A protein has these predicted regions:
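N-terminal strand-loop-strand beta-hairpin
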Residues: 1-129
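Beta-strand-connecting loop/turn residues
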Residues: 121, 139-140
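Glycine-rich, acidic/polar active-site loops that bind/position phosphate-bearing ligands
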Residues: 143
């Protein structure tokens, strides 16, 4: 499993204001892509009320749509949290697949069910020192 470091925050301004701030700080657009995630959960865990604990038991069936290619994969995200719900360790592992529908059918047969669909539009900006990934989630939230 590949472990990662990162910070996720919800942005309080609109996308236009955020892009203006990035441009003023010499950030340039490097990449644009979309991710369509289907979160699947083992039925025995579906009634967990703690959202962070619930997400520990999910598998993502993911369609990544870039300008010149499309990648379909199963993703498992591993996260550890502190007592305040902050991520202290995270990683993920991926397995490429040929069909989103066949993957959903396989997990249904294994006792999983669809929990939620999340559609992300991602913009990657970078300058000489830093890189930011702007994630527009379901056309409502910006991270």
């Amino acid at each position: 499993m590949k472990f990662e470091k990162g910070i996720t925050i919800e942005v309080s301004c609109n996308i236009e204001e955020l892009l203006k701030i990035l441009k003023e700080n010499d950030f340039e657009l490097k990449e644009v892509y979309d991710i369509k995630d289907i979160y699947m959960i083992d039925k025995k865990y579906k009634n967990i009320e703690d959202k962070l604990e619930l997400l520990k038991h999910t598998i993502l069936i993911r369609d990544i749509i870039e300008e010149n290619k499309e990648t379909k994969q199963i993703t498992y995200k591993y996260k550890e949290y502190d007592e305040n719900g902050n991520i202290t360790k995270q990683g993920k592992t991926n397995c490429k697949i040929n069909s989103i529908e066949e993957a959903v059918n396989l997990f249904n047969a294994l006792g999983y069910e669809k929990l939620i669909n999340i559609n992300d539009h991602l913009l990657v900006y970078a300058n000489k020192d830093d890189e930011f990934v702007i994630e527009c989630v379901n056309n409502k939230h910006i991270y």
